[in-house]
Regions:
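Thiotemplate assembly-line natural product biosynthesis machinery
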Residues: 1-24, 76-84
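Short-chain dehydrogenase/reductase
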Residues: 47
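Phosphopantetheine carrier-protein modules
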Residues: 18-37, 56-64, 82
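Conserved catalytic core of two-component sensor histidine kinases
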Residues: 44
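Catalytic nucleophile serine of serine hydrolases
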Residues: 40
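AMP-binding/adenylate-forming catalytic domain of the ANL superfamily
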Residues: 62-73
């Protein structure tokens, strides 16, 4: 596997474990907020998890829906932070 795939898998596992959503509900492109998977508190917990698990720091200006809307967008954000 490659790094981006590994990141996606780790994030998906976290989302499923913490929200009790079924794996069938959490696809790479599923809108996690529009589908009600995460609320504002879940978002804060997600940020804390990402910063801890991937040893990155998200700037306030990066906390945009576009960066955290789906597994794909979260993984892309994490991947870009790791490679900077």
């Amino acid at each position: 596997m490659n790094l981006l795939t590994d990141i996606k898998n780790q994030i998906r596992d976290y989302v499923i474990e913490t929200t009790y959503a079924t794996p069938e509900k959490i696809k790479d492109e599923t809108s996690l907020f529009k589908e009600g998977v995460f609320d504002s508190m879940g978002f804060i917990m997600l940020i804390n998890y990402i910063e801890s698990a991937f040893e990155i720091k998200a700037k306030d200006t990066e906390l945009l829906e576009d960066n955290f809307e789906s597994i794909n967008s979260i993984a892309g954000f994490v991947y870009s932070k790791i490679n900077n």
